[in-house]
């Protein structure tokens, strides 16, 4: 398993997340998998962004082998618990990331639960506003473009 951490010295978030949760207890969560079903696909990356001592950081746990799925899950949960993180913010996580993680936890027989966290699914919150905002779609890239985030994949 490989773990990386990066601190962004000059990054400032343009949005006040304290209206939704205490910024010091928030993890922005994303996972990467080899497919869409936990039963037949591997979880190979868990990544999160968080505020630490007034600076934004990212941490990633990367499974270099299939057998390391358990390690990255346990490491993520240990980090979240030790840091006192209570809220997960994600994009469409209610439909994919959280169920996938839950199924992997169960399959691996781990004594962990995602239910200990509050959750904010940005997709679910934005979805009812699609037409009001004039969004052509609810894809993450479309929403990023709408709020002025440009990225290249």
Task: Identify the residue ranges that each predicted region occupies.
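N-terminal accessory regions of nucleic-acid-interacting proteins
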Residues: 1-24
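RNase H-like nuclease fold core
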Residues: 33, 37-52, 58, 63
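Metal-dependent phosphoesterase core characteristic of DEDDh/y 3'-5' exonuclease domains
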Residues: 41-44, 57, 88, 94-153
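Conserved residues at beta->alpha junctions
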Residues: 63, 91-92
């Amino acid at each position: 398993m490989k773990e990386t951490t990066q601190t962004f010295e000059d990054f400032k978030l343009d949005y006040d997340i304290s209206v939704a949760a205490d910024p010091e207890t928030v993890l922005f969560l994303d996972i990467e998998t080899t497919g869409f079903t936990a039963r037949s696909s591997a979880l190979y990356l868990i990544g999160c962004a968080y505020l630490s001592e007034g600076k934004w950081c990212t941490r990633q746990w990367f499974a270099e082998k299939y057998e390391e799925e358990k390690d990255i899950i346990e490491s993520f949960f240990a980090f979240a618990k030790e840091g006192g993180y209570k809220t997960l913010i994600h994009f469409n996580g209610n439909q994919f990331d959280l169920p996938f993680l839950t199924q992997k936890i169960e399959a691996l027989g781990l004594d962990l639960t995602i239910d200990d966290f509050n959750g904010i699914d940005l997709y679910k919150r934005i979805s009812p506003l699609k037409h009001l905002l004039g969004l052509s779609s609810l894809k993450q890239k479309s929403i990023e473009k709408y709020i002025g985030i440009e990225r290249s994949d």
